[in-house]
Every structure is written in C-alpha cells, then in structure tokens.
C-alpha cells in the first residue's frame, strides 16, 4: 500500500528530475579537452622526482563545476583537487592550473594524512603542499617562444 505522502513525494521527485523543456542540469560537465589536459599534466609531473612513484591518473576525474566555486570559502579558487577529482570553475583553464591540481592529487597519493593536517593547520600561502605544487608548475613550464625565432 502506498501512502498519500509517498505519492506526493514521488510526483515532486519526477517533476524535479525533468524541468520545463525536458532538460536536466548537469552537476558537473566533462570536457574531452580536459581529459587530455590531465595527460599533459601527468607528462609534466613525471619529469619530477618529488615522490617515489609517478602520479597515477587512471582513476582521476576532472569536472567543470562552476556551482562549487560559488560556495563561500571556495570563491577565490579557479580549481580544487579532492582525493581523485579535480573541479574547475570553467573549461578554458591553462595547463598550469591542471598541473597544479594534479600535483595535489599526487601529494595525496603519498602523504594524504599529512596533507589534510597541513591544510587544517597552515595558511594557504605558507602551506608546504601549495608551495610544492606551485614549484612543480614552475619547474615544468615550457619557456615561452621568443618572437621572431
């Protein structure tokens, strides 16, 4: 027997799934170009010897999720890395940002608890993992082509 409440909830759920026009807003969008950007970032990080093993990207996801960056506390960021997921504010980001965020995933693959501790106890600019990620980007950045050459 189905209660009136569950019928009402079911009807509201069905309406919520299909807004007017039949489209459902995606929580996060996957861009094929970003998957390629992760591979380019891995190639860059593989030239470094910060950790005993290279970064593993087989389970890394990258998503465009502008809604995440509207949350107070995250508004100043353009990218954010979780354990295996990189969230980006928009799809048109430089490879340096993807490399920076992938470096955080690499750090987490080797020092997850220490990373979490430092994140809670250290300011952003002086966090050793942020410093290391910025250094990784700088050390792997290609020199800009000089005009006329």
What are these regions (language model features)?
Residues 48-54, 77-84:
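Peri-catalytic and regulatory segments of divalent metal-dependent proteins
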Residues 1-67:
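A metal-dependent hydrolase signature that marks the N-terminal structural subdomain at the beginning
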Residues 2-3, 140-142:
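Pan-zinc metallopeptidase signature
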Residues 96, 100-108:
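Active-site recognition of the HExxH zinc-binding catalytic motif
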Residues 78-98:
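Short pre-active-site segment immediately N-terminal to the catalytic Zn-binding motif
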Residues 143-149:
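Long, well-structured alpha-helical subdomains associated
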Residues 71-74, 82, 92, 107-135, ...:
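Post-HEXXH active-site segment of zinc metalloproteases
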């Amino acid at each position: 027997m189905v209660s009136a409440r569950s019928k009402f909830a079911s009807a509201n759920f069905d309406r919520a799934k299909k807004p007017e026009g039949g489209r459902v807003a995606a929580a996060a969008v996957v861009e094929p170009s970003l998957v390629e950007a992760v591979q380019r970032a891995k190639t860059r990080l593989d030239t470094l010897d910060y950790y005993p093993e290279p970064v593993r990207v087989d389970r890394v996801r990258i998503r465009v999720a502008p809604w995440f960056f509207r949350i107070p506390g995250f508004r100043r960021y353009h990218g954010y890395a979780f354990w295996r997921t990189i969230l980006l504010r928009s799809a048109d980001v430089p490879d340096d940002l993807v490399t920076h965020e992938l470096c955080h995933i690499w750090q987490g693959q080797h020092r997850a608890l220490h990373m979490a501790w430092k994140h809670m106890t250290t300011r952003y600019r002086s966090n050793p993992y942020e410093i290391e990620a910025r250094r990784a980007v700088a050390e792997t950045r290609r020199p800009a082509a000089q005009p006329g050459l």
